[in-house]
């Protein structure tokens, strides 16, 4: 998997991906991360990459020429997606991460200011993606979210079992985790986790996962692959808490 990030701040991308899992994945050749400086491609003598918006209004807009030229300089013959990170985009989900992880190459455009000239989107962008309903100082931080979440799904980057058990893998949030010591500031590890009974532990974790999801992200429940036992458990819980499903 190759990530090609078009950015005004390549050091943000390169420094943040030089640690932990992403660093090891690059060393093993499982992923490759390139940061292309958009400013290197501007034809403006002052190296500007932004200008005032037509029609007036607050803020500046990134100009089309350096972005498109930067893209054309690194564009390969391989099929690839070109992702623009924007609040106006489709909401990013684990399913989209899985879809992107199947690609050989992804080009990610990081915007700044009020965004990029619409003609960039019209000419080269295949996907407009938003990581949430909030505003960031630049697209680099959103790009790092994509790189990390997609890389984890690339075969060999992390253990397959870890991927399968993580939150959202079944449209459910993950169960609580505990480690030593047994008691900390009066709070003890649930006894079932010390029982050695793997079937009981599995059941407890499943129920905890269901509870976390219904409390924090009830919108995920409808998309989850629920068993008859799961449904019965949720009905009992919701009735006891007077929650309407």
Swiss-Prot record:
Organism domain of life: Bacteria
SUPFAM superfamilies registered for this protein in UniProt: alpha/beta knot
The UniProt similarity line reads: Belongs to the RNA methyltransferase TrmD family.
On subunit structure and binding partners, the annotation says: Homodimer.
Primary enzyme class:
transferase
Keywords from the named record? Cytoplasm, Methyltransferase, S-adenosyl-L-methionine, Transferase, tRNA processing
Q: What is the lineage of its organism?
A: Bacteria, Bacillati, Bacillota, Bacillota incertae sedis, Caldicellulosiruptorales
| One of the record's GO cellular component terms | cytosol
Please tell me the species this chain comes from. Caldicellulosiruptor saccharolyticus (strain ATCC 43494 / DSM 8903 / Tp8T 6331)
Q: What is this protein called?
A: tRNA (guanine-N(1)-)-methyltransferase
Q: Which reaction does it catalyse?
A: guanosine(37) in tRNA + S-adenosyl-L-methionine = N(1)-methylguanosine(37) in tRNA + S-adenosyl-L-homocysteine + H(+)
Q: Which NCBIfam families match?
A: PRK00026.1, trmD
Q: GO BP, one example? A: tRNA N1-guanine methylation
One Gene Ontology molecular-function label: tRNA (guanine(37)-N1)-methyltransferase activity
